[in-house]
């Protein structure tokens, strides 16, 4: 079977919402929503191998540490394992006073009774009721009309009131989800929710949560936002309900749908860390939270150690986080492209510690979420001078002059092409050494003596010549400064084009780095590098580095 030439013969476009006066497009999100993690329930039920009690407790503690205040822990009536985990949390004192446990149940009395029993002794709890309301579920799955579906929800809501009254020591909050809300007629979803809220007698001081799931993502995010805005406008007792979002990622836009839903008036978000969940997953709470953070809004969740959180999630879920996953993937703060690296390097150079973050290509400062800058720039065959220069400067304190960056980047590119792999900072540093600092043929500096004579510098150098066998030579020269004097004593014509120097490190362990660009015998300009404790020695080493590289190049050209 192949894809259809005319998919409209099999698939229908989701209808748009008649909301010409929609206001959400002009809104911005200015505060964090209430966060509810469904990792231990929705996320866990989607795993090939569900978590055991040890992993669940580890995950629970991670969610608490991050700052999630409402955590859906299980479906207690589904299994003894789920029931026991709720009891472990309550009896083991694992629920902080500022955190609320949430559990889920279907609309059957035996399941509801078992669910409330699991929560006995809890200080406060959210009990979450759901039943599917969309036309396809009514027709295909349940064979119920609208009245029947509404009756199921209302009867279950009454049972919630009954069983909650039997445990008055617990502070209860009720939640209702018209499952498949985004595929349900809006008027009918409102009708069912109004009826449930009426049974629960919601008030501003005892709010009911109305969770509006995109159980399966069936439309573009703007349509979901229209549905949420319409619902917020039309639901009864709006001041007594919290509108909660529960999006999935079937079309790849779960985060966008959630953000637009918040703009449309929602108060709360249910989802999973890094987007685990059925099929393509629930909305990723981390991405939504850090999207807020990078817009200057405190998400009230702490991902200062995002890699530590990822480690727990990966080990508990036994699913690796994709290397391109927003904010947390191994490669999301990494630039291989030369132009990107150059922009990032310049951004870091100009970034003020207490200023607005404006580093190109990095929407968040990696340090804010516990990431180092070491992996921001990595070098492969697509990289340019900026990335190479950045790595040498950050890791080794070596600041290459601009024109030398261009020359050395070509050296690095030849090596990455040869290897077919990326190069680490250590490998790049080693290549710099072999190409420049170890360029000692045909002349290697052995020693030098510098003195002032009548306002001029006089230099005498001893070099080891590796031309026709190894011999030591002595050259003398005078000039206005040490380098000019050395050039005057060389046996070949040399023109210095550029010279730079800087310190590496500080204090007694500091060294001097010297960079020289020169032209030998009128040929093309080449660069040399010298590093030494003494700045004069470093500059002489740099000159011999460039001289040798040029002469070797000329010899190869003539061969």
From Swiss-Prot:
Subunit structure: Homodimer.
Protein name: 2-isopropylmalate synthase
GO biological process: L-leucine biosynthetic process
Function recorded in the entry: Catalyzes the condensation of the acetyl group of acetyl-CoA with 3-methyl-2-oxobutanoate (2-ketoisovalerate) to form 3-carboxy-3-hydroxy-4-methylpentanoate (2-isopropylmalate).
InterPro entries recorded: 2-isopropylmalate_synth_dimer, AIPM/Hcit_synth_CS, Aldolase_TIM, IPM_Synthase, LeuA-like_post-cat, LeuA_allosteric_dom_sf, LeuA_N_DRE-TIM, PYR_CT
Family note: Belongs to the alpha-IPM synthase/homocitrate synthase family. LeuA type 2 subfamily.
Domain Pyruvate carboxyltransferase positions: 33-307
